[in-house]
């Protein structure tokens, strides 16, 4: 172009070129003509226009197709920035700078995006190949066949029917329940229909439902059968006087009898049977309660270990509520371990607790000398309750004899000093009896015992046959114990003698215990007239008092001799005859051994020592480590004794 080759200066060349060649057919001249009268664009406007064009090109996918135009546009933008205001842009450069945006915005031309050669359009099957076909495309036959199979299988399982026979109509009544409550619950639980047999028909249940539901209902009916068997046997047995036959066809289960006193049957059953039901649920057993006109025997059925647990819970409940222990039969644990049931609680009702002697136990005559049964001329029935210890009338026959009430003196003679006491030496097993805790533990300091207020400076006249108590030197213990009598003078005695011309008697509360525990001292009750009441003074010069642990130098088992000090049996018998039992009076009320103020009316469980007032017993049980002050046995509860 001639206008663009020779331009003497920027202003004149630009003007002359545009005016001298107005009709130039090239489209660039028209653009230059339009741009000539306008002022040169600012650098910011040019950059913005270029950025807009690049955005449009990139949106249309043409950014990579024309890299040369982009470079030229960039260079023209740089040149326009360098020109400034004094030197307008040349027409050629202006044409190059403006041409791409005009071309892009006005005439985009053929779009390469729609060109099949550049990017071919994918077919629809390729796009939706990853999706599963619509179920309708599979045809109605497949769906219909599947639904028919499901319905057919369900229809087959619903039509399951099975007959469940039971032995008798008593079982039907037990399984159906009162007003059908049990069978309704079983229907709802198993989702089945159970047809109960009509009275007079065969006792067969008809169960309809799915197979697994029918099996579950059958198991439920048969699992409840053993309870109904027991009830049916009970109704036909005619009472519990003999051995109650156990339920048949129940392998591994056993039935035992738990005999209790008449007066505690209602206590074991509880209000509306709540107690016995709780024991049944806790031990997984079935317990048949005795009728009002039957023997007081509970029939417990279940697995052997569960039956034993139920028996223990029944005995524990009686012990907890009454403070007394049960010896339910000859196979009782308390028979086997040789301990006594010796709580002074039940009064004349103690005859209910008597029992036949166990054939496997040692003969009771061997222990009569130490316990005083033979010495008092009474029958040798083991393990009675000693209810005559409060001076009450002796028990009528055939109640078990009591060494406290059998001789009529309301007291007890240690060591069997009566005329019928056997002489000689007995084995330690024969000498084992309910007073093992009389072995005194003299190693306990005086401040650690509750008997410190009753210490004496003078020797105790009542223990004249015990040189160890009176301060005489004691010989080492030979390890044997004698039963009674004047023979074998050098044999150490197990317990002290208490003869007194005025009729010395005492009351010694006994307790069941597992092992003989040594104690700091033993509470003895003074006689009605021989000993004064305890006032807390520590010196008694003329009257006998309680023994103190600080007076003796060794245990009472180490007494060397008693030939000169032992009184005659005549004196013992005369003392027995002078203190005949009379009606209980206020003078017989015992004082609490802890506070010496309140009346002893509370006992500790499980040892059974009734030596405390209620306040002291509650205070003992409230300690962090509660224990009985007399036997050091852990105490679990304090009970109030009404005698």
From Swiss-Prot:
Q: Where is the composition biased (Gly residues)?
A: 405-418
Positions annotated as zinc finger (RING-type): 592-632
Which InterPro entries does this entry report, sorted A to Z? KH-I_MEX3_rpt1 (IPR047228), KH-I_MEX3_rpt2 (IPR047226), KH_dom (IPR004087), KH_dom_type_1 (IPR004088), KH_dom_type_1_sf (IPR036612), MEX3 (IPR047227), Znf_RING (IPR001841), Znf_RING/FYVE/PHD (IPR013083)
Sites of Phosphothreonine modification: 491
Q: Locations of Acidic residues compositional bias?
A: 83-92
One GO term in the molecular function aspect is:
mRNA 3'-UTR binding
Q: Which UniProt keywords apply?
A: Cytoplasm, Metal-binding, Nucleus, Phosphoprotein, Repeat, RNA-binding, Zinc, Zinc-finger
Biological process terms from the Gene Ontology for this record are: mRNA catabolic process; mRNA destabilization; RNA destabilization
Q: Where in the cell is it found?
A: Cytoplasm; Nucleus
GO cellular component terms given for this protein = nucleus; perinuclear region of cytoplasm
| UniProt function note | RNA binding protein, may be involved in post-transcriptional regulatory mechanisms.
Per the record, the domain comment is: Binds RNA through its KH domains.
Instruction: Specify the protein name.
Output: RNA-binding protein MEX3D
Query: What organism does the record attribute this protein to?
Result: Mus musculus (Mouse)
